[in-house]
């Protein structure tokens, strides 16, 4: 066991250690310059890209929420407007219905009044025509009676015949 430390100490060369240490430092410097800086740059770019994408996604999410809210408001307004339009249309329809009914009633009354007036006029014309016929028949009967100078029974018979004849001619 006493020989072990001597063997270890004898095998170590300080020049080799320093050379390996310098080579390692040069290798680390080269790796840092040519590999680590570009790798860190790429990682930084990737980090910036991901950050921008997250920021963009958040902005788009905010915009989408804003648009969704605007659409909800517009939909609510459209529903209210359509409800108002429907109510107005119902009111206008009811008003027009009442106006049409009122106009029909007025027209009906006008037609009734016109028909009554026409009936009265035709009745008066018929009565006037009947009076003319009665008058002409009376004159005719009187002239016939005078012409014949009949007795009372013959006159009565003649009047009845003419009245019967006048009734049939109507």
From Swiss-Prot:
Q: How does it sit in the membrane?
A: Single-pass membrane protein
Principal cellular location given in the protein's record = membrane
**Disulphide bonds in the chain:** none
Where on the tree of life does the source sit, at the highest rank?
A: Bacteria
| A Pfam entry, by short name | ATP-synt_B
Determine if Cell inner membrane is one of this entry's keywords: no
Write out the entry's keywords from A to Z.
ATP synthesis, Cell membrane, CF(0), Hydrogen ion transport, Ion transport, Membrane, Transmembrane, Transmembrane helix, Transport
Where would you find this protein in the cell?
Cell membrane
Q: Which Gene3D superfamilies match?
A: F1F0 ATP synthase subunit B, membrane domain
InterPro entries given for it? ATP_synth_B-like_membr_sf (IPR028987), ATP_synth_b/b'su_bac/chlpt (IPR002146), ATP_synth_F0_bsu_bac (IPR005864), ATP_synthase_B_chain (IPR050059)
Q: Name one GO molecular function term.
A: proton-transporting ATPase activity, rotational mechanism
The record describes the protein's role as: F(1)F(0) ATP synthase produces ATP from ADP in the presence of a proton or sodium gradient. F-type ATPases consist of two structural domains, F(1) containing the extramembraneous catalytic core and F(0) containing the membrane proton channel, linked together by a central stalk and a peripheral stalk. During catalysis, ATP synthesis in the catalytic domain of F(1) is coupled via a rotary mechanism of the central stalk subunits to proton translocation. Component of the F(0) channel, it forms part of the peripheral stalk, linking F(1) to F(0).
Subunit info?
A: F-type ATPases have 2 components, F(1) - the catalytic core - and F(0) - the membrane proton channel. F(1) has five subunits: alpha(3), beta(3), gamma(1), delta(1), epsilon(1). F(0) has three main subunits: a(1), b(2) and c(10-14). The alpha and beta chains form an alternating ring which encloses part of the gamma chain. F(1) is attached to F(0) by a central stalk formed by the gamma and epsilon chains, while a peripheral stalk is formed by the delta and b chains.
- Can you name this protein? ATP synthase subunit b
Give the organism, scientific name: Bacillus pumilus (strain SAFR-032)
């Amino acid at each position: 066991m006493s020989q072990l430390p001597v063997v270890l100490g004898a095998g170590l060369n300080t020049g080799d250690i320093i050379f390996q240490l310098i080579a390692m430092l040069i290798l680390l410097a080269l790796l840092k310059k040519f590999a680590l800086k570009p790798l860190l740059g790429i990682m930084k770019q990737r980090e910036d890209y991901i950050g921008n994408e997250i920021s963009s996604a958040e902005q788009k999410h905010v915009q989408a929420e804003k648009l969704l809210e605007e659409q909800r408001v517009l939909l609510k307004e459209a529903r209210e407007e359509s409800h108002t339009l429907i109510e107005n249309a119902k009111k206008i329809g009811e008003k027009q219905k009442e106006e049409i009914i009122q106009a029909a009633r007025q027209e009906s009354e006008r037609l009734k009044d016109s028909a009554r007036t026409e009936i009265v006029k035709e009745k008066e014309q018929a009565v006037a025509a009947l009076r003319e016929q009665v008058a002409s028949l009376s004159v005719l009967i009187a002239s016939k009676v005078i012409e014949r100078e009949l007795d009372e029974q013959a006159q009565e018979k003649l009047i009845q015949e003419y009245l019967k004849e006048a009734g049939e001619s109507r």
